[in-house]
């Protein structure tokens, strides 16, 4: 029998917090226990082999059975609700990486609940008809092609009451590709399909296809309207590697700016005017390149374009890979990010090289980071590694900032008595918005509201999403029951989520203020707070002057270095 592989990664808060000691049980299709594992300090289990069937079955469009063997996983941890994932497809020669996102138990919760997710066969093996509609241009469109990070996915048909989840764009594409096609397909077939998936999603965002109709999401997971997405499913190594390389590349027609509407179907039981998923396998086996495959199904003048506008990223990729011997501000940025990330992931070694100089310790930290997050462990900071480091840095620093805010607000243990609804304003609304911001880090279906003290439509949507998540009537009104649930959830997070390593005593960074700087931007970049900068420098206001020298608290290893914004 053929062999495939399974690796489980238990994390929470957008990967900012690895969960060690999670008990993982792997069962075969009939429920027999095969492995009992425990996650390490990175939240990861060893990769285990599992029997499956030969990959030739998943490369044959006429095979009517399951081209894989299914397994089930149960994840349990003290202080967290449990997760059971069934019908996980394991393919010949492929490693399935299963993300286990556990939800902290509420403060008053006596026993864990169990969430169940079923995976099953990919959409290409389904006979469901597709009715994908879209345009290359719309009266209401964005001016630039932007990678939405995160992208908001509605887990149902457009008009259904299903929940929305937010995921990073690369993770979304990996999920869709793993849900749509077989990971055992030839390389160029995989690439052509992934280009179509990326471009389809970017077309929905660019034309504001759903948001212009009043919906609060970017795309659905309904294959009748959009493309498959199974929240909580495993991602396959062959797909993950390609997406990391091309997630910001898309298909457009020559002379046009907008992402082409790349409709597709399986091409066997369902036919369409767009790309045939099974047809890409035949064309790839004939030696066609990904672009040639795309031009076979779409207009002959389509081309591959790239956008570097990615929302939610602290620093954009400099355009040139960083490696041993590289120097400069970009190297310094990565060193700062890695030294902060290692507080949450202590297996990453400390960067002790001089600031801005890519030497042995930087190489070791980069390589370990790549190993932990399923990137090619070559020690080179290319596009995929840069954006993953940047994304994780944003996640860990956001948690630290929220913790600092909670101390400043003095949340306490007794909820406010005021009943809040859309139109309310004031300190209680700020408290509400803060609680929702914290909860949104651990509950993927709860969107993050702006913290402005005004109960607007965004806060109302967040409240209703939270109410659905905790089985309250989603009326958008914050009365006693909702306040209690908010506090129970918030206190449960504080009690059950492991804290990162304490910040080491570091030196300071001398920072020369330049045009466009603000205390908030500087604090975000160096993982500190505005208050900490003001205290260290004896500032009584937020006003900065160009050329002013500030001392910035540093968690890095170098005691002092001078940094000037370019």
Regions found by a protein language model. Give the residues of each.
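Primarily a LysM-type cell-wall glycan-binding module
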Residues: 332, 353-361, 430, 452-458, ...
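Conserved, single-site charged/polar hotspot
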Residues: 1, 21-25, 38, 48-50, ...
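Short, ordered, surface-exposed loop/turn motifs in non-cytosolic proteins
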Residues: 14-34, 38-41, 331, 429, ...
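Short alpha-helical segments in extracytoplasmic peptidoglycan/chitin-binding modules
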Residues: 276, 283, 335-338, 365-370, ...
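Short, acidic Ser/Thr/Gly-rich low-complexity loop/linker segments typical of extracellular
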Residues: 32-59, 345-347
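A short, amphipathic beta-strand motif
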Residues: 4-12, 100
